[in-house]
Amino acid sequence: YKSAVTVYDASGEKTFAFNSSEHYVIDAVVMRDCKRMAAVTLGESDGIFADTVSIYSLGSDKADSVNTLTGSLLLSLDSVAGTLSCLTDESLTLFSSDGTLSGSYRYEYPYLRGSSMGGDNYAALLLSRYRSGSTLKLVTVSSDGTEMASLDSSQEVLSMSAAGKYIAVLYSDSLVLYTPQLQEYARLDGTEYARSVIMREDGTAVLIGSSSAWLYIP
């Protein structure tokens, strides 16, 4: 085999194995319902590199659905509100658990600088107009691929994380928590000591520095 994927349960017992003899598996994820697994293999279609997204029911070696993403580079697999999210360098494509297309969002700015899929029924994307610099756009996208809100920014963004009802954005000198509609919910100034942030489901955020971490409670 060129590659293989094995799924284990919480006790460490193997529940599913997928082997690919023709293509290389570049990513795989157990879907949020814990009943299916998605795997992406690298191949080509009509002479163009293409990623094939296959969804398997755990316990079956036959794919329930097969979809092809052409002309873009897959960056990661995740889940938004139960859908399978395929994050590429050009768009966010969402599939339902049975493999049907739920929606797709093509980036308004050409460069993806960050992403987080942990929000309640939405994804947060940080896009850039240029390869470097701070002409940025923060976007929230629903599970059907519809843009919910966008916010332009000229500030340097060090880190972004979405969880539950809020998105935490760490700027060079402040931390701002936004709602999915990108309305400011809370702000903490003077955060030059922090390098990254993790938003938590309970509405708090963890600021991480070079050797310490701090819990921010709005």
Predicted segments, located by residue:
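Short loop/turn segments that connect beta-strands within the blades of beta-propeller domains
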Residues: K2, D9-A10, D33, F49-D51, ...
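Structural motif
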Residues: K2-T6, S45-I55, E90-S96, S132-V139, ...
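Repeated scaffold domains used in trafficking and secretory/extracellular systems
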Residues: E22-R32, L69-G82, Y107-D120, D152-K165, ...
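Residue position within the beta-strands of beta-propeller blades
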Residues: A38-V40, C86, A124-L127, V169, ...
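Solenoidal tandem-repeat scaffolds enriched in leucines and small polar residues
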Residues: V5-V7, T15-G99
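Hydrophilic extracytoplasmic domains
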Residues: V139-T146, D152, V157-P218
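Eukaryotic tandem repeat interaction scaffolds
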Residues: C86-V157
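A short beta-strand motif characteristic of beta-propeller blades
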Residues: E13-N19, D61-T68, T100-Y107, D144-L151, ...
